[in-house]
Amino acid sequence: MRCRPKLWCIVVLALFPGTLPAADLVFSVTEGVTYQATPKEIRDKFEPLAQALGTALKRNVRVVLVPKYNDVREGLAKQEYDLAFIHPAHVALAEVKAGRYKTLAWTAGYTEYTVSLMVNRNDTSKTLPDLKGRTLVTPDPDSITAWMVRAMLRTASIGSNEVKIRTTRYQDAVPFYLEYGFADVGATAANSVVKEWTDKGGKVFLKSRSVPIKYFIVSTKLSADEQERIQRALVTLAQTEPGRQVLGAVGYKGFVTPDHAVDTAAIDWLGL
């Protein structure tokens, strides 16, 4: 009697359940809305990292670009992504608070992100209450910079009707509003923007508290063993030459183990 192919497959799977290849691990990437980069540039950056993680996990890691914050929020809410690299912090931390994801790593060099409040050289502002009745420009309202500005105002008990807030999409557009009188104060977290502004004689009168900004989070659906292997692979990249080549491609110095107490404090401060 001939053994039908389907029956044979069932027998093989019963005897050798580990013979099927593991499903792809879905790795979503969301970069900030206030930086300008093409999808191809972002994908090219992260493919070597995906390959390195795949080697550590012995399974294929598939990169999925999710540029829009609301799109990644929707996917995270359904735990469609096994692993996610997310800039900005508030999107990642909302999922950490919800318990659907855990922080695996922070990005080295991006653990103390601060907002600078810039003014023209003759401005006399010294404290946040000095902003009352004035116009403040921030990047995109759903950028981490804008979220941090709102946290600063809330902490200082300044109501939303006491400061007029204008928004512009990109960080490097903020000085334009100050130069041409469309705003009195400009908020940015881009060091290059701050340097250019102060080099021209402008001032920074106040800085925010700092928060980590670029997060690696992992779905709580993954096993503890897989979570640990991903974290170990990330934080040890800088220790080997192949790992440093991966970091060179992605454009970061490395990844570090997070401090969960800092995450908890940031969740509270940002009002998530």
Residue ranges and their predicted role:
Residues M1-C9:
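Bacterial N-terminal signal peptides that target proteins for export
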Residues W8-G18:
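Bacterial N-terminal signal peptides
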Residues A23, V29-Y35, G109-V119, T198-A238, ...:
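Periplasmic-binding protein-like
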Residues A23-A92:
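Extracytoplasmic small-molecule ligand-binding "clamshell" domains
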Residues G32-A52, A56, A89, Y113-F176, ...:
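Bilobed "Venus flytrap"/periplasmic-binding protein-like clamshell domains
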Residues V63-E74, N161-F176, V211-P212:
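Short helix-initiation/N-cap motifs at beta->coil->alpha
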Residues V66-D130:
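Acidic, polar ligand-binding/catalytic clefts
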Residues P88-A98, R150-A151, T155, F176-K207:
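A ligand-binding cleft/hinge motif common to bilobed small-molecule-binding domains
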